Amino acid sequence: MKNQLIDRLTRYTTIDTQSDPKSTTTPSTEKQWDLLHLLEKELQQLGLPTDLDENGYLFATLESNIDVDVPTVGFLAHVDTSPDFNASNVKPQIIENYDGKPYKLGNTKRVLDPKVFPELNSLVGHTLMVTDGTSLLGADDKAGIVEIMEAICYLQEHPEIKHGTIRIGFTPDEEIGRGPHKFDVDRFNADFAYTMDGSQYGELQYESFNAAEAVITCHGVNVHPGSAKNAMVNAIRLGEQFDSLLPDSEVPERTEGYEGFYHLMNFEGTVEKATLQYIIRDHDKKQFELRKKRILEIRDDINAHFENYPVKVDISDQYFNMAEKILPLPHIIDIPKRVFAKLDIPANTEPIRGGTDGSQLSFMGLPTPNIFTGCGNFHGPYEYASIDVMEKAVQVIIGIVEDIAENH
């Protein structure tokens, strides 16, 4: 199976599907259609009925081969790649039998070094796909697409493997937070699903952050600095004051595990107007609400010193901790846990310090945990995929549909 995985991942990663947060269309970029149309064709060649809508959501079905009713399971992956780094002219490189030493990426000065990326030490002996140092790889999430496609191929080649109805979904714009926005849960018609969008071997994730964005707008009064006393209000300094009143220890670079944070993503302005953009994250719903409350309290504290209330705050929720919807349905986690145990894969159920499409889909009526893909260092030139771990991910997909047929 390794050769098929390499071939398919190479073909998919060389198609530029970078999404664009500034776009207002869905998909956000026309080039995502290139991979969507290819996948539609390949699924049809496998004999699967497909449904590609005007928003770039590609669904397909592998029909049940058993006579009893069992839950319909879905497998999801996203076609877009991150806008954080160059995604054009991707030239995948193959490292056979990785020796654990630093590896120079193409003709660049970039080096994939285990001292910097210690998770590479667990991949000694693996076949790796890496970049040439000039682009990201796009294994996030094309590795997930590959794993789903190869699992479907295997199931069709082995009809003796019993399974219920399987739904497949390939979606746009996950990297810019819009993946589920036009996802039709009723049309997808699955009882539950799994995103193949994790990273390291053994990840089984069903807890995510609660997430919100806060935009703080500070309005100043700009007068000539030579006559500014008691007249000027510097919006930049208001923004600095606002940020200084947030806990200095509760930022991404000083937190881990279940610890939440405030993250100042952007700060720009002039004396007359300054804007701060934060993301707010916490696994605990009560703490999440308290974080949002703290933002409003800081606004009020600053505004109390002015007559015209110069600081405005706009807070919008982005997604919530999917554990709230998944934990009441323990079988959705028990199924992959049994499969992991059967395959001798140690399950890592640490919470996601982020979100997936499943974070939103779970609150839309489709409970959706996340499973490893075998890739790492997403969104940049040091991205890699372990073909060996990808093969295990394919086995997990096959094991899940077998388990559902046997135990439900």
From Swiss-Prot:
Catalytic reaction(s) noted: Release of the N-terminal residue from a tripeptide
User: Where in this protein does the record put region Disordered?
Assistant: 1-28
Q: How is the cofactor bound?
A: Binds 2 Zn(2+) ions per subunit.
Protein task: Cleaves the N-terminal amino acid of tripeptides.
List of residues binding Zn(2+) 1? 78, 140, 197
Primary location group:
cytoplasm
Q: Which InterPro entries match?
A: ArgE/DapE_CS, Bact_exopeptidase_dim_dom, Peptidase_M20, Peptidase_M20_dimer, Peptidase_M20B
- What name does UniProt use for this protein? Peptidase T
For whether the record's keyword set contains Cytoplasm, the answer is yes
Q: Which family does it belong to?
A: Belongs to the peptidase M20B family.
Does this entry carry the keyword Mitochondrion?
A: no
Q: Which GO terms describe its cellular component?
A: cytosol
In alphabetical order, the GO MF annotations are: metallopeptidase activity; tripeptide aminopeptidase activity; zinc ion binding
Start-end of Polar residues biased regions: 11-28
Kindly list the positions annotated as binding Zn(2+) 2: 140, 175, 379
> EC no.?
3.4.11.4
The region annotated as signal peptide is none
Q: Which cofactor does it need?
A: Zn(2+)
Keywords (A to Z) from UniProt? Aminopeptidase, Cytoplasm, Hydrolase, Metal-binding, Metalloprotease, Protease, Zinc
One matching Pfam family is: Peptidase_M20
